[in-house]
Amino acid sequence: METYKDIEAYRVGPLLGVTDFLFVFPFLEYLRRRKTSSMRLELGGGDTPWQSEADRRMIREDLRGGATFLTNHRDIIMDAAWLSFLLRTHYWIRPYMGIGNNLLSKRWIEWLVRYLRCYVVVRDGGPKEVMKNAQHLSAYIQMLRGKGKSIWLAQREGRAKDGNDLTQPAVLKMLTMGSGDFLDAIRKLNICPVSINYEFDPCDYLKAREMQLRRDDPQWKKPKGEDELSMKTGIFGDKGRVVYRVTPSLNHWMDANKEELEKMTRNEQVQAVAKQIDYQIHIGYETYERGEAFEQYLQERLVMIEMANKDEAYLMDKLHEMYRNPVLNHQAAKEKKGL
């Protein structure tokens, strides 16, 4: 049997529960009370098609044998941390969570996150190494799902800086590597898309700054400490109202569209599944009312951006964009018809 010591989460059994109870959950509860005005986990609801108690029972049943929670990605740490906290609190589900090795800048950080049920997504190397790492990760995730474990993974590599959350087909290809039938592999993963909604993004001004830096220099690379600053800002920054909305397993959609999906090529199936994940995440958005106070908030965020050659018009446009795109995607999802 192949081992996964280079990427696997540490298996610490009951000790994980003790650590959660004594350290992790009190800290997350502190952040919930101090850094959000409200937080809730919903099964369907909101402005989605899944409104009834029967819909909620269906989603709870989807979670019973473990699921792959594929989400939009806004915050490096808190996206997964609060999802894990909420699932554990409400349904006693503790998902394994993916974390990029680029974030493991120190040995103690790697030890800690693996201890907290994080597995490592290795992103280093040339094309051959990338392919080998993807195969290794895919086999590990499929092994966990074969044992009924739940998984968290973002729908794309890196955060969507502009708020335009779109599933990367490469993520789906990685998850189904080594499988003869793509749709069968997706079914075994039991993907339940989750929409993560923050009223305010503490890292919005840092993201806008990064977008100008990349615009001005396409070869720009993050300096040492940039990710650590984003992690700290995301953890301790105010997020306002927070909503995590779990949508049904893709298996229901696949059952309803079985004949049409089976006529497609594998690449067409990948694209169709990616679009359905996008739809379920977009339709699950919580759309927040924005008034004059929000414009003042954006002005304050603009002032916080420190950089040479500061293009205030561009930066303000990017700040608006990252809050506007979810609303536009939600509206488009409501108008969607067919595959």
Regions found by a protein language model. Give the residues of each.
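Conserved nucleotide-cofactor-binding alpha/beta core module
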Residues: 96-131
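Membrane-interfacial terminal anchoring regions of lipid-handling membrane enzymes
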Residues: 1-67, 73-92, 96, 100-107, ...
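Short helix/strand-bridging catalytic loops that position acidic/His residues to coordinate divalent metals
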Residues: 129-130, 157-162
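Residue-level "edge-of-site" marker
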Residues: 126, 157, 294
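Acidic beta-strand-to-loop metal/phosphate-binding motif
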Residues: 154
